[in-house]
Amino acid sequence: MSLRYLRFLTAGESHGKGLTAILEGIPANLPLSEEEINHELRRRQRGYGRGGRMKIEKDTAEILSGVRFGKTLGSPIALFIRNRDWENWKEKMAIEGEPSPSVVPFTRPRPGHADLSGGIKYNQRDLRNILERASARETAARVAVGAVCKKFLSEFGIKIGSFVVSIGQKEVEELKDKSYFANPEKLLSYHEKAEDSELRIPFPEKDEEFKTYIDEVKEKGESLGGVFEVFALNVPPGLGSHIQWDRRIDGRIAQAMMSIQAIKGVEIGLGFEAARRFGSQVHDEIGWSEGKGYFRHSNNLGGTEGGITNGMPIVVRVAMKPIPTLKNPLRSVDIETKEEMKAGKERTDIVAVPAASVVGEAMLAIVLADALLEKLGGDFMEEVKKRFEDYVNHVKSF
């Protein structure tokens, strides 16, 4: 992902020793603890319809560098998440030596996965060399990085949340009226209620109804996708820019969301619905008051105009395709024999939309932390906060 101020990388295979992330650019003197990161990792592991892997992994992050006595140093922050399942995969995922006769190559690519495309690109006859890195297990490292960025944003009053809008063909009917996009209190309430739901639905009383639907789909050997919503509150106007294509904040957010495994669509504000409305029904009228300053009477555009944040809540809906590993595999071809046969199988989830919403929070936090630091600069928190205060005063006086 292209960032302008922050830099981060992740490394690690799904069944390797663990996942590593390095984040550079966070200012010095930000209070940070491992527990704050681990809280986000626990949220990612929740959700009805998850696979057996979640019973094995209890993700915790270890801070290896960049923090001393509970505060960031301004140097790169290195994080490590150990894979507990590694103990069961030492032979299959050995770093050195030759594979033993018991290690069977994965040669039947799964439709919808990176298996075949990646095998061709990197000339790998054992497709496990592709699927291990392509796995959504990698998102645990991104959630850890996002937790640091969330903590940074919280120092400026910026809050990020999410909830599930639909799973498969089953929608949360109450979320079809999108007038709440302009209501920070309603958005935050939905997020808080989703925290009490196994499916991250902002109406936990609907959990059993949705779980029954998931169980019925599972019995058919199918998997499910869905739509989740992620939002940010108290984001100041002026992040991003209209000046060049790659500086537009909505483009940066969309790219970040599309980089999440299995994501196939992103809407900001009304998204595709805006294309079916008249202009007068889409564009958010502007108001001003002594206490609030400039505001919009609605938030159909999801908090951005011209590639720049406008001070309204940032609201993003993200579409996740069904998980491609199926109990009843689809047709494929063995890359060694070229014979048509059923695709290979791996342990997998039935639905992972609730977990993906937490990953979406992390990616939004990374993009906004990067954009805020791009706007303000600064090497230590006290300096950044002073610049933020000056900018807020500028906004109020404009």
Swiss-Prot record:
EC number(s) given by UniProt: 4.2.3.5
Binding positions for NADP(+) per the UniProt entry: R44, R50
Cofactor(s) annotated in UniProt: FMNH2
Binding site for FMN: R133, A134, S135, Q261, A262, G306, K321, P322, I323, P324, T325, R347
EC primary class: lyase
Entry's cofactor comment: Reduced FMN (FMNH(2)).
One example GO MF annotation: chorismate synthase activity
NCBIfam families: aroC (TIGR00033), PRK05382.1 (NF003793)
Family the entry assigns: Belongs to the chorismate synthase family.
The name this protein goes by in its record: Chorismate synthase
Species whose genome carries this gene: Aquifex aeolicus (strain VF5)
Gene: aroC
